[in-house]
Amino acid sequence: EGDVAKIKQINIIGAAAFKESELLDLMALRTPGWLTWYTKNDQYSKQKLSGDLEILRSHYLNRGYLEFTIDSTQVSISPDKQDIYITVNITEGDRYTVSSVKLAGQMLVPETELAALVKIKPGEVFSREALNESTKAISERLGNEGYAFANVNAAPELDKEKRQVAFTVLIDPGRRVYVRRINVSGNTRTRDEVIRRELRQIESAWYDGEKINRSRTRVDRLGYFDEVTLETPPVPGTTDQVDMEIKVKEKPTGNILLGAGFSSSEKVTVQGAVTQQNLFGSGKHVGVQVSTSKSNKVY
């Protein structure tokens, strides 16, 4: 098969706001180094390159470069098929600050409350991350009121002369949704009621995103499961109903501990303990400890 081709050089063409070396340090792909024998990051991977390009894009968009684009990428290999060369051509564009942010649409929650969730403020350098966090927070707040499928999008208006951007956050709550049924599966040992008593969302009640998240957290904290997944798929044929699907993967909850000791007065002593955190799937904890020591007998 021969030797695996290694990345000989990576070039980023068009970078001015940041040093090329700084941008290269953000990427997973790199030229051979003292750790690349283990990470294999000096071997070309289309998937890794796609991830690196997204990292570059996020780096610029989170620092004000709203019009940043990756124009092209070229990957070439040397005639002897030993060296790989990667060239990324970018256009940075201007750096934008935020001039204003306003809310529009059907809010259903006091506007002042939603405005407080906006993390991007006038006068600040534009950040895609902060903008996405803002729209997500508004969507989640509406979800707490039953609007599980709310659409919240930010429409930009650029002033290229002033290098400023104004955003209008458009809010469409959609229909209010309630939880039709709660289904639990995967609990081969733990009883249904042990899981259900941890739930904060109830059946036939309005969807509440916060209560649903708390429900998943509480089930996970029981400590009986390796995995806990919670999904809320729409009920087919309806526009205002979802089911809450909880899937768990059981894990061992019992422990057996054995030990032995030696002393001049008692020679050999034996200790043992058996604990079960989820007795017969009931959620009850039981433990038994035994010691043969004359000075300290425990049953």
Question: Across the structure, where does each feature detected by a protein language model lie?
Answer:
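Periplasmic polypeptide-binding modules associated with outer-membrane biogenesis and secretion
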Residues: 1-264, 273, 287-298
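Short loop/turn motifs that connect adjacent beta-strands in outer-membrane beta-barrel proteins
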Residues: 279-285
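Short conserved beta-strand segments at catalytic cores or DNA/RNA-binding microdomains
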Residues: 275-277
